[in-house]
Amino acid sequence: MFREKAFSQVSSSFVSPLFPKAGETVEISILLSVRPEVVILKYDTDTGLVFGKEMKEEGMENGAYRYSVSVPVTTDGEKFTWYFSYIISGVSRYYSKKGITRYVPSFINRFSLIPGLESPLWVASSTCYQIFPDRFNNGDPNVGAKEGEYEFDGGSVSTPEWTDEPKEWNESRCCDFYNGDLKGISDKVEYLKSLGISAVYLNPIFSSRSVHRYDTVDFNHIDEKLGGDPALASMVKTLHENGIRVILDISINHTGLDAVWLKKAREDENSDEHDFYYFKSDGSVECWQDVRTLPQLRYSSSLLRSYMFRRPDSVMKKFLLPPYSIDAWRLDVSPEVGRRGSDQLCKDVWREVRKEMHSVKKDVYLVGEDWDDSAPYMNGDIWDGTMNYYGSGRILRSWMGQRDRFLSKDCGHSAEREENWTGYEVAGGMKEALDGVSDQNVFFQMNLIDSHDTPRFHNDKAVFDRDIYKGAIMAMYMLPGMPNLYYGDEVGIKGRLGSNEGARFPMEWREEYWDMDMLSFHRAMGKARKEKWLGYASYRIEEVDEKAFAVLRFTDHDAYVALVNRGEKREVKLDLFALPSDRVEIVYGKGEAKTEGKELNVSFEEKESILIKMWK
């Protein structure tokens, strides 16, 4: 419909500064393939009206005309939005996240900033490694669970050999401790660095009865079976000295049955702790999702909020401060917190958590667990990012031919085959997910395919194809945000379908059992992610054809193109508008890539995905 091309985005190349304070002047730019008669930035003002300001031509950039203008951003904490208008041959156009249109873009499609947004800027340039602590590595044989030490939920503590397969829940009752510990994580710091890891996400480590530790007994202390409080302080110190941040998992939604708070509540119905829970008339307690070992916490209690996140010595503040000094909280079942019956306090709780955490650490990262579209929580006042199942994991699994977990039995653990998504569907789904999130928060999403709550994709033999899987992983590494690698995926760790237990096998440390090809691939992706320019680079998700899509990341000087393919041997073309393309190099994959004008011509083998680097 339109002969010209245009591109702008909330990224380091088009908005400066990217995280302004209220009242600060921001330079905003756009690239156009032709020289219009006039280009105008239409932007919010503190009058409540949209003003227009003519943009100045700055010269040519990668074959396009660059126009820029500086404007003051408005009220602290409120969205500052804008779009562009221009005239070619007497005909007006508009440009927004919707692309080029003849109509004025709606508010939801306008570009936006949140002035004064306090953000964890380190996230966008990080690569994360998720660790299930009991199953990663044993570093201190003097700590850990003992065989038959106690009984819990109908089971008794067992200590299998490291090479034993985990039993199903009905046999183990989540009491099978392999005795991985925090020192074991410290001991593997060089291994983590070899993967390009700069952040680790640990599943819960608080004092608990079960191996998954979501049934917290005491939030104020680290489980002695993992080494206790000193082990956390020591581990964080070691990781920080090696450039690795630490994300801890916390479920403020519920405790365990043996929680110190619940014990006091049951002993004395007049106690403060009694108000922390939802007690029924028969004296029993309401539990999250009716899981009898996970009694739900009640956030209409002001004192509970004080203990959990308000007080200087509250749980969530304590571990952000020395001697622990963690960097982030992963927020378990976060859309469900504060919700039961007439209590609908979820957003209120998280807004207060954010305010309180930022009072002690300005760059703390708050990442929610949400399997759906998180747009309502991603407006700068609740979470920084989410475990991005919606915009990465669920889409990439569908691309590889696995039915979406919410359409399959056992929440996806008994995975089912389905017709693969096309390149058009993948690109459409990813773009919709990205456009729904507040523009600055795009860079704080935690992108993933596998986790402790999903079957490991490479263990699903009905759909797994090594070459197609590599392409999906490549896309995960290149999407804006932080890629998250689940421990052991890089070496093809064993596992099974059907339950969470099948995704929580002990880490394989015997190198003769490693998938060296997959390990080499992950190391190559980790190395690519370390490019300093990549964190806040612009992005495009492009449909190539039915069996290919592309993730493009770029600045005015550097670019990566991840061409993800599950089709036959062929040649394809990609539009390189706004990208630097003087020099071209294939970083990973087999094929040929060359530029002709502002097009990239790529030839590749069947099911071969390619990562291409370009620069000027």
Role assignments for model-derived ranges:
Residues 34, 596-616:
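C-terminal beta-strand-rich structural cap/linker in extracellular carbohydrate-active enzymes
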Residues 30, 131, 192, 202, ...:
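Conserved, mostly hydrophobic/aromatic
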Residues 36-46, 80-82, 569-590:
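Beta-strand-rich binding/interaction modules
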Residues 542-579, 610:
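Carbohydrate-binding surface patches
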Residues 132-198, 205-324, 349, 353-359, ...:
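Substrate-binding/active-site clefts of carbohydrate-active enzymes
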Residues 1-129, 198:
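Glycan-association/targeting regions that enable binding to alpha-glucans and other polysaccharides
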Residues 503-543:
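Aromatic- and carboxylate-lined catalytic core of secreted/periplasmic carbohydrate-active enzymes
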Residues 121-123, 262-264, 268, 316, ...:
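Conserved alpha/beta catalytic core and glycan-binding cleft of carbohydrate-active enzymes
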